[in-house]
């Protein structure tokens, strides 16, 4: 009987000890680290410069090339948007240009009166002069803005074209010309010298008359 009572107390003691023992806490674990997204690297590709496609027929190019071998200098009368209803006299040799604007007032008796514009394409300079015998005050008058004073020449019209094709033939000023559709407009190009006698572009007309080839001297285009 005593053994049974002792065993009972032993069992009760074990139950009490178990009930009073602190519950085992789970071990904390480190939070799971999410992978850091790397910023996307943008590779900038170099931009290729697209050159305009040149479409100039072989026969027209051969016509334009005549101006390089047959025209060393030239003088002509020009009428265009810059001149109104009047003609300007042009003299061209190499990179030197002189043109004489139309003078509504023929007297050149003022200090700032001028009758000629001289242009140097290489130096990009322009200046006004009074050279006529009846100039009261001869010599240089003032420097001018190059872009303001410059008027495209017969050579400029056939330079830097990206398109040119023959569309016909006509006679202008008793000279045979090719009618050529170009990226700058319609040109009537002298069949022998390869330079335009007429041009039409954006509804405007340009005329080059009384051409004289290879007669211009340095003294005509360089102020003295």
What label would you give each PLM region?
Residues 1-4:
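Positively charged n-region of N-terminal signal peptides that target proteins for export
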């Amino acid at each position: 009987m005593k053994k049974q009572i002792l065993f009972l107390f032993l069992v009760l003691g074990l139950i009490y000890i178990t009930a009073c023992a602190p519950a085992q806490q789970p071990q904390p674990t480190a939070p799971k680290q999410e992978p850091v997204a790397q910023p996307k690297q943008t590779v900038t590709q170099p931009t290729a410069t697209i050159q305009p496609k040149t479409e100039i027929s072989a026969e027209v190019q051969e016509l334009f090339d005549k101006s390089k071998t047959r025209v060393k200098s030239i003088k002509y009368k020009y009428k265009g948007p810059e001149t109104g209803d009047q003609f300007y006299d042009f003299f061209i040799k190499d990179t030197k240009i002189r043109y004489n604007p139309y003078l509504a007032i023929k007297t050149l008796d003022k200090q700032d009166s001028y009758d000629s514009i001289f242009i140097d394409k290489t130096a990009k300079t322009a200046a006004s002069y009074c050279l006529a015998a009846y100039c009261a005050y001869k010599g240089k008058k003032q420097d001018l803005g190059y872009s303001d004073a410059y008027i495209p020449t017969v050579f400029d019209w056939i330079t830097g074209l990206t398109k040119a094709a023959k569309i016909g033939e006509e006679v202008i000023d008793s000279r045979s010309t090719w009618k050529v559709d170009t990226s700058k407009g319609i040109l009537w190009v002298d069949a022998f010298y390869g330079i335009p006698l007429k041009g039409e572009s954006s509804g405007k007309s340009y005329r080059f008359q009384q051409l004289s080839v290879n007669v211009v001297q340095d003294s005509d285009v360089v102020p003295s």
